[in-house]
């Protein structure tokens, strides 16, 4: 995620980091060079009686813009839902530890439970990003629990099970009443709902055929556009063609980024920072001495 302070409108025009321009610059360069080639080809295909007009491109451009808008809205809806889910995880984690800490007197046992919660947040983050987990989870889990988690097809769900087992032990030992156990178990169910929601987004992409149709249409439109512009604009064709192509290709590229909000690209959710915030909050609630430093945006204003 790009966390950039407010800038003057003129400076914002030339912003590079955080823009999709770095991804599509090669496409725009090819479009510019192809437009120059079309200028030199103009006498040849005019001699053949071939004439392109702007009318069909105007109609097609409007249609593409509408469907790109629909696709970007769908991608942004996934992004917003993903952020809401991680917000719910933060709320449920704080509430669960608060209830456990104010109910159970054993600080050592509560510390173990807090580390299970932190491990869950990091495990969910790394699962969604398809990152190796053993090294990070080893800081929070016991050896036997770590082995169970790493052997599971759903590591985050396994940690939830271990948390449920921990609550069950406290109940059998008489530390928790049935009412408190049910209340705390409901918190675990809230966290489980977050896990299922994140998996739903991560494993259900926007239908490929829909994406492919738009992608093909956008690039074919940008390839054919110089032939229609050159009749009226001539030497200005490369510049106008690149400007129009930038609008369509950048929207197509941005939609691809928003489709998977859990990645590590510029416009994805800052899961590292969210997990860091959860860890800091839970450790401070438990009066821990060693608190990790808060993750801040880098020099390019990117928060991962």
Description of each model-found segment:
Residues 3, 245, 249, 254-304:
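Cytosolic/matrix-facing juxtamembrane and C-terminal tails of multi-pass cellular membrane proteins
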Residues 98-208:
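Structured inter-helical modules in multipass membrane proteins
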Residues 10-22, 179-180, 186-217, 263, ...:
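Membrane-interface, cytosolic juxtamembrane amphipathic helix immediately N-terminal to a transmembrane helix
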Residues 75-79, 88, 99, 250-261:
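Membrane-spanning helices that line or support transport/gating and their immediate boundary helices
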Residues 87-103:
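Amphipathic, membrane-active segments
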Residues 1-87, 106, 233-235, 280, ...:
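N-terminal juxtamembrane/topogenic regions of multi-pass membrane proteins
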Residues 33-50, 218-248, 252:
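Juxtamembrane "helix exit" motif at the C-terminal ends of alpha-helical transmembrane segments
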Residues 210, 225-228, 236, 262-266:
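Long amphipathic all-alpha helical oligomerization modules
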